[in-house]
């Protein structure tokens, strides 16, 4: 079905893709074909090692897709909407081939070892102006509560030292802060941003921190400005609200997994 759809869209193109679009198309097509071929072989041979290695080939695909979408939005695929849509459909279906190959590898591993499909790990990034309180606390809470299904990080526009009181509060709840400052938003690489599933602004909208969001990532604004109390009470108030919101978020994005 994917091959038929790709072929149907390809014949709609007035000219073959060129430049960056052509390069990315070749890369993704090669990856999809190789993964599918190896996945089928792994399944037929009941080769769990080959299946595991093949699954790893899918890791760069999400990053490459962001480069593809950026190139398309930048005009490298032309401005004709019909052509843009056709190219988008082609890339999307190649990505689905990669996904199906990965699924087949997971079935192979289960058949050979009895190991169930690994839970998908969602990457969540919290943003705060100075990163002195809310963002590092949200990161610590997320990694404590959802360590099997979430990978949480934090960044700040103008990183300041994390409040000592916040560090002590988290320590009293069994959570250690591995650094004294958040990473700077300016230091986030394109790959780091592209790997995020959700980016959350805690004291301002995400677009005040990140001008260009990755194509597939979701931006949320929690606007936690009204944390009440002082000292321990302030940290407790933030802790309770962040814990509830993080649990609700993970429940929403994981669905029935």
Name each region found by the language model.
Residues 1-125:
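Cytosolic, long alpha-helical scaffolding segments
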Residues 131, 170, 199-200, 242:
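Conserved small-residue
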Residues 177-199, 203-207:
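S-adenosyl-L-methionine/SAH cofactor-binding core of RNA-modifying enzymes
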Residues 209-257:
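Phosphate-binding/catalytic loops
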